[in-house]
Protein backbone atom coordinates (compact mmCIF):
# COMPACT_ATOMS: atom_id res chain seq x y z
CA UNK A 1 0.00 0.00 0.00
CA UNK A 2 1.35 3.43 -1.02
CA UNK A 3 -0.18 6.78 -0.13
CA UNK A 4 0.48 9.89 -2.24
CA UNK A 5 -0.80 13.43 -2.12
CA UNK A 6 -1.55 15.41 -5.29
CA UNK A 7 -3.22 18.84 -5.44
CA UNK A 8 -4.79 18.34 -2.03
CA UNK A 9 -6.16 14.88 -2.89
CA UNK A 10 -5.02 11.72 -1.18
CA UNK A 11 -4.50 8.83 -3.57
CA UNK A 12 -3.81 5.38 -2.21
CA UNK A 13 -2.52 2.45 -4.23
CA UNK A 14 -3.69 -0.96 -2.99
CA UNK A 15 -3.09 -4.25 -4.74
CA UNK A 16 -3.05 -2.76 -8.23
CA UNK A 17 -6.08 -0.46 -7.83
CA UNK A 18 -6.22 3.28 -7.31
CA UNK A 19 -8.38 4.63 -4.48
CA UNK A 20 -9.39 8.29 -4.37
CA UNK A 21 -10.26 10.02 -1.13
CA UNK A 22 -13.75 11.47 -1.59
CA UNK A 23 -13.61 13.47 1.62
CA UNK A 24 -15.24 16.82 1.00
CA UNK A 25 -13.19 19.99 1.07
CA UNK A 26 -14.01 22.15 4.12
CA UNK A 27 -15.85 24.75 2.00
CA UNK A 28 -18.01 22.01 0.45
CA UNK A 29 -18.76 20.52 3.83
CA UNK A 30 -19.79 24.00 5.04
CA UNK A 31 -22.34 24.29 2.20
CA UNK A 32 -23.70 20.82 2.90
CA UNK A 33 -24.01 21.64 6.60
CA UNK A 34 -25.90 24.87 5.88
CA UNK A 35 -28.34 23.09 3.60
CA UNK A 36 -28.77 20.16 6.00
CA UNK A 37 -29.43 22.58 8.86
CA UNK A 38 -32.00 24.49 6.79
CA UNK A 39 -33.79 21.28 5.77
CA UNK A 40 -33.84 19.86 9.30
CA UNK A 41 -34.55 23.02 11.28
CA UNK A 42 -36.58 25.17 8.89
CA UNK A 43 -38.27 23.13 6.13
CA UNK A 44 -39.25 19.99 8.05
CA UNK A 45 -40.78 21.84 11.03
CA UNK A 46 -42.68 24.20 8.71
CA UNK A 47 -44.16 21.30 6.73
CA UNK A 48 -44.90 18.98 9.65
CA UNK A 49 -48.33 20.48 10.52
CA UNK A 50 -49.59 19.73 7.03
CA UNK A 51 -48.81 16.00 6.93
CA UNK A 52 -48.89 14.42 3.49
CA UNK A 53 -50.34 16.80 0.90
CA UNK A 54 -52.63 14.09 -0.54
CA UNK A 55 -54.32 13.76 2.85
CA UNK A 56 -54.46 17.49 3.54
CA UNK A 57 -57.92 18.99 3.97
CA UNK A 58 -58.85 21.46 1.24
CA UNK A 59 -59.18 24.14 3.92
CA UNK A 60 -55.43 23.87 4.70
CA UNK A 61 -54.11 24.16 1.14
CA UNK A 62 -53.93 27.96 1.24
CA UNK A 63 -51.86 27.82 4.43
CA UNK A 64 -49.65 25.15 2.87
CA UNK A 65 -48.91 27.36 -0.15
CA UNK A 66 -48.17 30.35 2.12
CA UNK A 67 -45.77 28.22 4.16
CA UNK A 68 -43.97 27.08 1.00
CA UNK A 69 -43.63 30.64 -0.28
CA UNK A 70 -42.29 31.76 3.10
CA UNK A 71 -39.72 28.95 2.99
CA UNK A 72 -38.55 30.18 -0.41
CA UNK A 73 -38.17 33.71 0.97
CA UNK A 74 -36.13 32.35 3.86
CA UNK A 75 -33.93 30.32 1.48
CA UNK A 76 -33.20 33.54 -0.42
CA UNK A 77 -32.37 35.37 2.84
CA UNK A 78 -30.00 32.61 3.92
CA UNK A 79 -28.20 32.54 0.55
CA UNK A 80 -29.44 29.07 -0.41
CA UNK A 81 -31.46 30.08 -3.49
CA UNK A 82 -30.66 28.71 -6.96
CA UNK A 83 -27.61 26.63 -5.99
CA UNK A 84 -27.01 25.67 -9.63
CA UNK A 85 -27.17 29.13 -11.20
CA UNK A 86 -24.44 31.78 -11.49
CA UNK A 87 -24.39 34.62 -9.00
CA UNK A 88 -25.34 37.16 -11.69
CA UNK A 89 -28.72 35.37 -11.88
CA UNK A 90 -29.18 35.39 -8.12
CA UNK A 91 -27.77 31.92 -7.57
CA UNK A 92 -25.03 30.41 -5.45
CA UNK A 93 -22.80 29.63 -8.44
CA UNK A 94 -22.10 26.05 -7.36
CA UNK A 95 -20.52 23.40 -9.55
CA UNK A 96 -21.73 19.85 -10.12
CA UNK A 97 -20.23 18.34 -6.95
CA UNK A 98 -21.65 21.07 -4.74
CA UNK A 99 -25.05 20.87 -6.46
CA UNK A 100 -25.12 17.10 -5.90
CA UNK A 101 -24.54 17.73 -2.18
CA UNK A 102 -27.35 20.30 -2.08
CA UNK A 103 -29.74 18.01 -3.96
CA UNK A 104 -28.88 15.10 -1.69
CA UNK A 105 -29.80 17.11 1.39
CA UNK A 106 -32.79 18.86 -0.21
CA UNK A 107 -34.29 15.51 -1.22
CA UNK A 108 -34.68 14.56 2.44
CA UNK A 109 -37.99 16.42 2.32
CA UNK A 110 -40.46 16.33 -0.54
CA UNK A 111 -40.42 20.13 -0.99
CA UNK A 112 -36.68 20.77 -0.51
CA UNK A 113 -35.68 21.13 -4.17
CA UNK A 114 -38.67 23.43 -4.78
CA UNK A 115 -37.80 25.57 -1.76
CA UNK A 116 -34.24 26.09 -3.09
CA UNK A 117 -35.57 26.53 -6.69
CA UNK A 118 -33.50 23.65 -8.06
CA UNK A 119 -36.31 21.22 -8.92
CA UNK A 120 -36.90 19.38 -12.17
CA UNK A 121 -37.61 20.27 -14.85
CA UNK A 122 -36.83 23.92 -14.06
CA UNK A 123 -33.22 23.25 -13.00
CA UNK A 124 -32.33 21.66 -16.33
CA UNK A 125 -34.35 24.15 -18.34
CA UNK A 126 -32.59 27.04 -16.59
CA UNK A 127 -29.24 25.56 -17.66
CA UNK A 128 -30.48 25.13 -21.22
CA UNK A 129 -31.62 28.76 -21.38
CA UNK A 130 -28.43 29.99 -19.71
CA UNK A 131 -26.13 28.26 -22.20
CA UNK A 132 -28.15 28.24 -25.42
CA UNK A 133 -30.97 30.76 -25.02
CA UNK A 134 -31.03 34.03 -26.91
CA UNK A 135 -30.82 37.28 -24.96
CA UNK A 136 -34.57 37.72 -25.50
CA UNK A 137 -35.29 34.19 -24.17
CA UNK A 138 -33.10 34.79 -21.14
CA UNK A 139 -34.87 38.06 -20.43
CA UNK A 140 -38.36 36.60 -20.86
CA UNK A 141 -38.01 33.07 -19.48
CA UNK A 142 -34.77 32.59 -17.57
CA UNK A 143 -35.25 35.59 -15.30
CA UNK A 144 -38.82 34.44 -14.58
CA UNK A 145 -37.61 30.96 -13.61
CA UNK A 146 -34.72 32.28 -11.53
CA UNK A 147 -37.05 34.57 -9.61
CA UNK A 148 -39.24 31.61 -8.68
CA UNK A 149 -42.30 33.25 -10.25
CA UNK A 150 -42.51 30.83 -13.19
CA UNK A 151 -42.38 27.12 -13.96
CA UNK A 152 -41.23 25.31 -17.08
CA UNK A 153 -41.91 22.06 -18.86
CA UNK A 154 -40.88 20.16 -21.97
CA UNK A 155 -42.33 17.43 -24.16
CA UNK A 156 -39.77 14.69 -24.54
CA UNK A 157 -41.35 11.21 -24.64
CA UNK A 158 -41.68 9.74 -28.12
CA UNK A 159 -43.15 6.32 -29.00
CA UNK A 160 -40.38 5.43 -31.47
CA UNK A 161 -37.61 5.39 -28.87
CA UNK A 162 -37.22 3.68 -25.54
CA UNK A 163 -38.55 5.97 -22.84
CA UNK A 164 -37.52 9.55 -22.36
CA UNK A 165 -33.86 9.61 -23.35
CA UNK A 166 -33.22 13.09 -24.78
CA UNK A 167 -30.29 11.86 -26.85
CA UNK A 168 -32.69 9.74 -28.93
CA UNK A 169 -35.28 12.43 -29.71
CA UNK A 170 -36.34 12.36 -33.36
CA UNK A 171 -38.79 15.27 -33.44
CA UNK A 172 -37.36 18.36 -35.08
CA UNK A 173 -38.50 21.79 -36.17
CA UNK A 174 -37.97 23.56 -39.49
CA UNK A 175 -38.54 27.26 -39.99
CA UNK A 176 -41.01 27.94 -42.80
CA UNK A 177 -41.19 31.68 -43.34
CA UNK A 178 -42.35 33.26 -40.09
CA UNK A 179 -43.55 29.94 -38.64
CA UNK A 180 -42.03 26.71 -37.43
CA UNK A 181 -43.14 23.29 -38.64
CA UNK A 182 -42.67 20.58 -36.03
CA UNK A 183 -42.12 17.09 -37.44
CA UNK A 184 -42.45 14.17 -35.07
CA UNK A 185 -44.69 12.45 -32.58
CA UNK A 186 -44.94 13.03 -28.82
CA UNK A 187 -47.05 11.20 -26.28
CA UNK A 188 -47.80 11.21 -22.54
CA UNK A 189 -48.28 14.99 -22.69
Where are these regions (language model features)?
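Amphipathic, small/basic residue-rich leader segments at the start of a protein or domain
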Residues: 7-120, 131, 136-151
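Generic alpha-helical propensity signal that fires on short helical segments
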Residues: 42, 61, 98-101, 112, ...
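Glycine-rich, Trp-frequent "lid" loop and neighboring beta-strands that shape
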Residues: 92, 132, 136-189
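Well-ordered alpha-helical segments within folded domains of soluble proteins
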Residues: 121-127
Amino acid sequence: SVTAHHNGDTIERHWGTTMIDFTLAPEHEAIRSRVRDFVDNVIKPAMEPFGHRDEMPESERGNYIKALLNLRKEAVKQGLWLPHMPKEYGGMGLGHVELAMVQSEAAKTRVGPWVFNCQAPDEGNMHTLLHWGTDAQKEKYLKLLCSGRGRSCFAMTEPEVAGSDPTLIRTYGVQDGDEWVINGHKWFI
